[in-house]
Amino acid sequence: MRKTKIVCTLGPSTDQPGILRQLLENGMNVARFNFSHGDYAEHKGRLDQLRTLSKELDVSIPAMLDTKGPEIRLGEFENGKEQLTAGQKFILTSRNVKGTKEISSITYKDLPHDVSVGGRIMLDDGLISLRIESITDTDIVCTVENDGVIKTKKGVNVPGVHLSMPYMSQRDRDDILFGIEQGYDLISASFTRSAQDIMDIRHLLDEHNANIRIIAKIENQEGIDNIDEILSVADGIMVARGDMGVEIDYAEIPSIQKHLIDHAMQMGKICITATQMLDSMIVNPRPTRAEITDVANAIYDGTGAVMLSGETAAGKYPVEALKAMAMIAETTESDTNYESLCHHVGMDSTRLTISAAVSHAACTTASDISASAIITASKSGETARLLSRFRPDAPIIACVLDETTCRQMNVYRGVTPLLMDYAHSTDELISMSVKAAEDAGLIHSGDRVVVTAGVPVGVSGTTNMIKVHLVGDTLLTGIGINPGLNAKGEVCVCRNAEEAAKKFKAGQMLVVPFTTNDTLPYMRQAAGIIAEEAGANSHSAIVGLTLGKPVIIGATHATRTLKDGMKISMDCARGVVQAMSE
């Protein structure tokens, strides 16, 4: 089960018949809606289609609204685009003019008051560099430093300059209100500079009683400098490397990426690494070797999610890009040292709570017993977030009560959310959550799982209990020999050595009334041994210890209860034999 989540941006390419369905079927975890492009009708149409297909395919996919943010763009060009030549003069103006080879209007009218002579302005994600020569109240006269084609509405970046423009524009406010009305689950806040930027959005959400999680997009030096205060109020961050690579020295991006991912991981917050991850797949069916390594390194660093932008929104190969991303993630995860990751995150005494301590203990317990999963029943999803922080190898199954929380949990690394009904007691909570996970095919009879919950039931933030639970119906009990060993397999009931000689096959679970030296060859080949005879000095016990085999002795009526061909599991530590689902 892949732990790293994949965010796919919807756009014209995903509007093609059948494409969105294929993305959902091939592992898309989050759908991103880029509000820098398109209108409300387009976004609503895509959201409606997402909700319809998600329900049909029974998947919980959150919708993420990516705001336009306090960005600066060029105005309209008479011919749509112009060729600029190194050495020529080019004017950026706050006046409303049609763009030509010599001049373009800009969307931020106070930019002439924020910049200085000698500074640099970058156009179109840094493809064209301008050096500021002189400034008037309305015009910024620049020298073009390199050849390039400039187009209508392309972005403008001013590296190292604090802009006095307000964070949330009326456009962003309207977009967020639209998102509240339509039921979006996440907001990615573009160009976040400070904690106050996030609080401005949160106040707007609170005014409308909206349960939407906020992810701060870190794209400039201010955001990097203020990362701790931003993380303290945001639900997570996006390492948005596109504008970041224009706003700061691009050679610093790898170290900044590691720094941001680590901060988010230490604080248990969502972390999405984004921009140009498989950029070549916009036009090519396979990624470059450098892109493969880029995705893998972000996962090695601990990112919780990776994002596809133009690859799925406007590319020729949206489904292939998703499949490639998923394959890279799965391969990288198989080579990840989870104990080292958990140790790296550790327990921070400044953020130590009972819930955090229990979550950490659940992760270490799951590692110690090689649990098939960690199951948490949570009203708010907070426990799932805490578990995800410690990056366990075992998948985290979060059983929640409402659809919005269920969708929101799908952005957290390693978390698979499930809907369940309200439980009235702790025992009911455990049984219902285990059954929900079993019904979903995430765990199976015979699996050992770690369950966390809160007592009393139904109170948020009270996770204070851990239980190791064996999934399935108990068929037999006895005394386990070699308690550190377990086995699963197909039953072969043999009442004596002659019967074993006729039908026993290597790797089966040997079920006998007792053993003798004549059955020794079959004991050697068995996956596990279940004997009715009891006693620590019995033949079965002594041979089991000598061979280092999982053995349960004293299993009364085993040869009558178990039938040939049954699939069972045995847990020597507990002396339990359970039925496995087919």
What are the language-model segments listed below?
Residues 3, 8-13, 42, 161, ...:
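Conserved alpha/beta-domain cores
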Residues 5-7, 30-32, 60-64, 89, ...:
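Structural preference for beta-strand elements that scaffold enzyme active sites
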Residues 9, 34, 66, 118, ...:
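Conserved, mostly hydrophobic/aromatic
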Residues 10-12, 29-40, 186-191, 237-248, ...:
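Glycine-rich phosphate-binding active-site loops on the catalytic face of alpha/beta enzymes
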Residues 38-42, 46, 394-395, 399-429, ...:
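Feature captures the catalytic cores and cofactor-binding loops of soluble hydro-lyases/lyases
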Residues 44-51, 312-335, 467-469:
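C-terminal helical cap(s) of enzyme catalytic domains, especially alpha/beta-barrels
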Residues 70-169, 436, 442-498, 525-526, ...:
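Acidic, glycine-rich flexible loop/linker segments
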Residues 352-360, 364-366, 468-522:
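Protease-associated
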